[in-house]
Amino acid sequence: MTVTVETLEKLERKITLTLPVGTIQSEVDSRLKKLARTVKMDGFRPGKVPMNVVAQRYGYSVHYEVMNDKVGEAFSQAANEAKLRVAGQPRITEKEESPEGQLAFDAVFEVFPEVKINDLSNAEVEKLSAEVGEDAIDKTLDILRKQRRTFAQRAQDAVAQDDDRVTVDFEGKIDGEPFPGGKAEDFQFIVGEGQMLKEFEDAVRGMKAGDSRTFPLSFPADYHGKDVAGKQADFMVTVKKIEASHLPEVNEQLAKSLGIAEATVEGLRADIKKNLEREVKFRLLARNKNAVMDTLVANAELDLPNASVQSEVNRMVEGARAELKQRGIKDADKAPIPDEVFRPQAERRVRLGLVVAELVRANNLQAKPEQIKAHIDELAASYEKPADVVRWYFSDNNRLAEVEAVVIENNVTDFVLGKAKVKEKSVSFDELMAQQG
């Protein structure tokens, strides 16, 4: 087959396809005969429906299917022969004029671009590092102790203070009117932990069991309850019970309750450090990977195929609809979500995907089986039964493909960091944990 490719735009191409009418009709006849052997129609026994009746009933739909199949096959063959990397689906239209005995079609489509990655030795990448110090272990230990704290009722004349658990009744009104969520009975919270707004905690702090108090409270403008955000309410609160919190001692008993294999204080701290170091490793990898990807995008030249961008936009819109549906939003499938909201992010994803694919191809950065296995082992190490987790990953090709994609990204990250000008920056454990992504 001689294939003539016409360039319309930067990435847009056109191929004219021709198909013999006889080939189309022969396939239509073949499919109708096959259909006639099994079709059921009133007034006829199965397999005994006359061909002209079958053709009258199903001829149009079968002809449509055959045309789709044959044109699709012809396009795939033509694109392969022309060594074209097609992006998205072609737009195929039948030509008004065709050679005798032929049907002619124009297929307009986009191809994937050539990707030029500039010399990475001139690129700069900031690489973060962080250590797990004793203070991070202490803070984690405090969190674990708080999760296992107990409470004991305080004396009748005791006043509420930080770390106490208080049980209260309260009711709030705005302009003298109650509002949804503004009233509760036997509500418990820990003073000083920020579960309640600061003005609420300040009002309760210093009260005794049995005391009541009224106070004004201003809801922040960005408060999650949109109906009350930015408004001022008047609250009445009554303290019913005050309980002091008691943290467990850091000892062998605490270590044992946490399931530490070496049930000693030293073993507990060592286990915490190991888990924190694993978390630090993954966070650093994610953050440094993002920095590398930003550098790649900034140092690559390519045109974006609109078909790929639109496909990614569609995927993101559907994802947004699914999230709305999960939140219980009515008619989420009909929610007006404009494509343009997601287009910049979709363009970046497509651009990054093409650049990474080219870097992987040009530098043989594909994931090796032993790398995939090592990554799964590392993921499984934090679970109680690592062997079960490993089997879970290897039992599903989709899960393996996800791991393979992560390993490829890690290979790309290591490759770029080995080529670029790396600026090392040390951050504290808390700074790293506070960073997004």
UniProtKB/Swiss-Prot annotation:
It catalyses: [protein]-peptidylproline (omega=180) = [protein]-peptidylproline (omega=0). The keyword Transmembrane does not apply. One of its GO terms (cellular component) is cytoplasm. Keywords: Cell cycle, Cell division, Chaperone, Cytoplasm, Isomerase, Rotamase. It is found in: Cytoplasm. One of its GO terms (molecular function) is protein folding chaperone. Residues 163-248 form the PPIase FKBP-type domain. GO terms for biological process: 'de novo' cotranslational protein folding; cell division; chaperone-mediated protein folding; protein transport; protein unfolding. Transmembrane segments: none annotated. PROSITE patterns: FKBP_PPIASE (PS50059). Pfam families: FKBP_C, Trigger_C, Trigger_N. Its EC number is 5.2.1.8. The keyword Isomerase applies. InterPro entries: PPIase_dom_sf, PPIase_FKBP_dom, Trig_fac, Trigger_fac_C, Trigger_fac_C_sf, Trigger_fac_ribosome-bd_bac, Trigger_fac_ribosome-bd_sf, Trigger_fact/SurA_dom_sf. Belongs to the FKBP-type PPIase family. Tig subfamily. Consists of 3 domains; the N-terminus binds the ribosome, the middle domain has PPIase activity, while the C-terminus has intrinsic chaperone activity on its own. Involved in protein export. Acts as a chaperone by maintaining the newly synthesized protein in an open conformation. Functions as a peptidyl-prolyl cis-trans isomerase. This is Trigger factor. It comes from Variovorax paradoxus (strain S110). The gene is tig.
